Regions:
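Carbohydrate-active catalytic/glycan-binding domains of CAZyme proteins
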Residues: 1-187
Length: 187
């Protein structure tokens, strides 16, 4: 899992991995990159991983995340979306179709949601199959994002296979000039 660091107005916020604490913590940066202060706690008594904060072109704010709803701590199978109504995360409206995805091959986030060069919204997701975490990545194009509807299509897959030296891969982040991927190689 990854900490989601993002700008929110003039603030820099971070959502670190806190699934074991059964809550989601939002931290505010006091002095980048080393000084942070707890700003808000949401989703108390729930186990979440890989939360993404995203602002669409219309200014709507969204949280995308993966929640475990069973005793086995499965965070791979379901994607949930919430609309963030205010600037303090006090009011979160659940998407009407939550969970919007139920499928371990595409549900779990694998990095920040971003706009590609064509202006399309892209959501990296993990391929978790064959009882293998990090089997591969998808790049999904979000084609519909409203409080009532959500649709995405896979446009690219990067999978562990015989022809690749990859043993595992589960994170993709698009920077301003670089792409960052974590991977485990076979030697």
């Amino acid at each position: 899992s990854y900490p989601n660091v993002f700008k929110f107005g003039k603030k820099i916020l971070m959502i670190p991995e806190t699934a074991k604490n059964k809550r989601v913590e939002i931290w505010i940066c006091e002095k980048f990159p080393k000084k942070w202060k707890l700003h808000k706690t949401i989703f108390k008594n729930e186990s979440w991983v890989d939360l993404n904060f995203f602002i669409d072109r219309k200014g709507n704010k969204w949280l995308f995340g993966n929640k475990s709803v069973d005793k086995y701590s499965d965070h791979n199978s379901e994607l949930y979306i919430y609309k963030v109504v205010d600037n303090n995360f006090n009011k979160l409206i659940p998407h009407e179709k939550n969970p919007v995805i139920i499928d371990s091959r595409i549900a779990r986030n694998a990095g920040k949601i971003f706009y590609n060069k064509k202006g399309e919204i892209m959501r990296p997701s993990q391929i978790n199959i064959y009882e293998k975490y990090g089997h591969g990545l998808n790049l999904n194009k979000i084609t519909k994002l409203t409080i009532k509807d959500y649709q995405e299509t896979i446009v690219k897959k990067i999978q562990v296979g015989k022809n690749l030296r990859l043993k595992g891969i589960h994170h993709f982040s698009m920077g301003e000039k670089n792409i960052y991927i974590d991977k485990l190689f076979k030697f």
